[in-house]
């Protein structure tokens, strides 16, 4: 297997074990985690790999036809081992192929992850390789397996009527339910979902730091991540390959991955509150498309 292919699967393994998101989805397994190809064949361009990472708002029913509350493109350049997380607020007003203009989270409801992928490909000009869809049912189990997640909060986060978050500012180690509350919180922030989507990207980076730290201290810790990933996901990767990929994932330093939310302005369409993506995003897409990195 080529280094580039290994890098792709390593990143997928990392995301699936390290970034459960938001409101839940039903599945045959506890997690409600699904993954698939955007196109029939995987054809990375010059070592650049792009994965669409989604969180569903569905607690019961078909998670793949629910509205997406978390929308991120993760890019990795397998040659430079740099990357980026490009975040899209769920209320972004975009053109959905075959349906006209609507909030971006409507795309998955209309046509599943594939339609949302097409929507983002048209918007950004980036050819996506894989999609990963997560729910929250396996989230707490994953955190319990791999350990509390260290993070520094610049302010108190209090959201009793929404996510249930009651988090004090400062250096914290988030337990499973506190971590879930953190990535779900929007009502506690003035800019709502814009802050939430940025925090989701930040949480992924904190998970990567935790993985790096644990494996640096004890290389056998990678088995704990593998076990958690295999228990809580529907990604079919053989155990021996999962091991190789997880080891590779530890080589991607969080400091080499940028976390950027597309620039937007708040507005309305009819009675609906939406956000409009700024024309300034065009340069951001071009940079990400060229380098698969936001660092």
For each feature predicted by the language model, list its residue ranges.
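Non-catalytic, solvent-exposed segments at the cell envelope interface
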Residues: 1-295
């Amino acid at each position: 297997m080529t280094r580039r292919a290994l890098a792709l699967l390593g990143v997928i393994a990392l995301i699936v074990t390290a970034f459960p998101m938001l409101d839940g989805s039903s599945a045959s397994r506890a997690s409600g985690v699904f993954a698939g190809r955007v196109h029939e064949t995987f054809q990375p361009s010059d070592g650049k790999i792009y994965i669409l990472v989604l969180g569903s708002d569905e607690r019961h029913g078909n998670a793949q036809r629910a509205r997406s509350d978390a929308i991120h493109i993760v890019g990795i350049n397998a040659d430079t081992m740099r990357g980026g997380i490009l975040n899209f607020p769920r209320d972004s007003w975009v053109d959905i192929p075959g349906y006209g203009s609507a909030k971006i989270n409507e795309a998955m409801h209309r046509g599943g992850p594939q339609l949302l992928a097409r929507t983002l490909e048209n918007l950004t000009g980036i050819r996506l390789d894989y999609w990963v869809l997560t729910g929250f049912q396996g989230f707490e189990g994953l955190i319990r397996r791999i350990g509390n997640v260290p993070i520094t909060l610049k302010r108190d986060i209090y959201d009793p009527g929404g996510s249930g978050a009651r988090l004090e500012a400062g250096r914290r180690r988030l337990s499973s339910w506190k971590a879930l509350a953190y990535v779900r919180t929007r009502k506690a922030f003035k800019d709502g979902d814009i802050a939430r989507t940025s925090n989701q990207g930040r949480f992924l980076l904190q998970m990567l730091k935790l993985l790096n730290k644990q494996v640096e201290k004890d290389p056998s810790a990678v088995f704990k991540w593998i076990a958690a990933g295999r228990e809580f996901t529907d990604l079919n990767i053989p155990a021996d390959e999962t091991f190789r990929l997880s080891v590779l994932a530890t080589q991607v330093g969080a400091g080499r991955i940028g976390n950027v939310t597309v620039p937007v302005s708040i507005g309305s369409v009819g009675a609906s509150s939406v956000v409009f993506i700024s024309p300034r995003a065009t340069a951001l897409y071009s940079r990400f498309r060229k380098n698969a990195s936001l660092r």
